[in-house]
Structures are given as structure tokens and as C-alpha cells.
């Protein structure tokens, strides 16, 4: 019975929020809201914009390092070990791994911006 009540409550709340989300934007319509101009891009211009491959590589490198730091660095503290030496060794290993990979990217000129 409690499961049915929880499911019904969640379904009702989700449906209500979806209805409100579709209904609210239609209350105040003005010309800027209905125009296709968005974020400084001309919708009638060329769809082929120049793309910097160097920027793409730096952005991918940043994302990889960011994910490594966000996901791997808390791992030693989340392992629930009582041994402080093991926890510090794991943390030091991950930090050294990040430093070595950053040094490798730097020596391979993956972070250089000059063309």
C-alpha cells in the first residue's frame, strides 16, 4: 500500500510539474522570446563555422584531467580503510599519476596554443 501511495504521489507531482512547465512560458509571449536569434549567432548565416582543432584538444585534455580529479582523488578516503598508510599511499599514487600525465602532455606540446 505504501509503495502504491509513493508511486501515485510521484506520478502526480511529475505530471503537475510538466503541465506547469508547458503552461507558464505561454503566459507572457514577447518578440524577443519568439525570435530564432540566440546566443549571438545569426540563424540565417553559414552553418560552417571555423573550428580550432587546438582548442578541441585542450578542451578534451581539460575534461580528462577534471574527471580524473573528480572521480579518482576521493577514492582513498572513500575506501573506508582504517590504515592511514594505505590511504596516503593511494592518494600519493593518484597525485603522482596526474602529475606524470600532465608532464607528458606538456612535453608532447599538447598544451601549447601556438599554431
From Swiss-Prot:
Q: Keyword Transmembrane helix on this protein?
A: yes
Q: Name one GO cellular component term.
A: respiratory chain complex I
Q: Mind listing the GO molecular function terms for this protein? A: NADH dehydrogenase (ubiquinone) activity
A Pfam family = Oxidored_q4
Where does the signal sequence lie? Answer: none
Q: Which reaction does it catalyse?
A: a ubiquinone + NADH + 5 H(+)(in) = a ubiquinol + NAD(+) + 4 H(+)(out)
| Quaternary organization | Core subunit of respiratory chain NADH dehydrogenase (Complex I) which is composed of 45 different subunits. Interacts with TMEM186. Interacts with TMEM242.
What is this protein for, i.e. what is its function?
Answer: Core subunit of the mitochondrial membrane respiratory chain NADH dehydrogenase (Complex I) which catalyzes electron transfer from NADH through the respiratory chain, using ubiquinone as an electron acceptor. Essential for the catalytic activity of complex I.
Instruction: Write the protein's name.
Output: NADH-ubiquinone oxidoreductase chain 3
Q: Which organism is it from?
A: Bos taurus (Bovine)
What gene is it encoded by? MT-ND3
Amino acid at each position: 500500500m505504501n509503495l502504491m501511495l509513493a508511486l501515485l504521489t510521484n506520478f502526480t507531482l511529475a505530471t503537475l510539474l510538466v503541465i506547469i512547465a508547458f503552461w507558464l512560458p505561454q503566459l507572457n509571449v514577447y518578440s524577443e522570446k519568439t525570435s530564432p536569434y540566440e546566443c549571438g549567432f545569426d540563424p540565417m548565416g553559414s552553418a560552417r563555422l571555423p573550428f580550432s582543432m587546438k582548442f578541441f584538444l585542450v578542451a578534451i585534455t581539460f575534461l580528462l584531467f577534471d574527471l580524473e580529479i573528480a572521480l579518482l582523488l576521493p577514492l582513498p578516503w572513500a575506501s573506508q580503510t582504517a590504515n592511514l598508510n594505505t590511504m596516503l599511499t593511494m592518494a600519493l599514487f593518484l597525485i603522482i599519476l596526474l602529475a606524470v600525465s600532465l608532464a607528458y602532455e606538456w612535453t608532447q606540446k599538447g598544451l601549447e596554443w601556438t599554431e
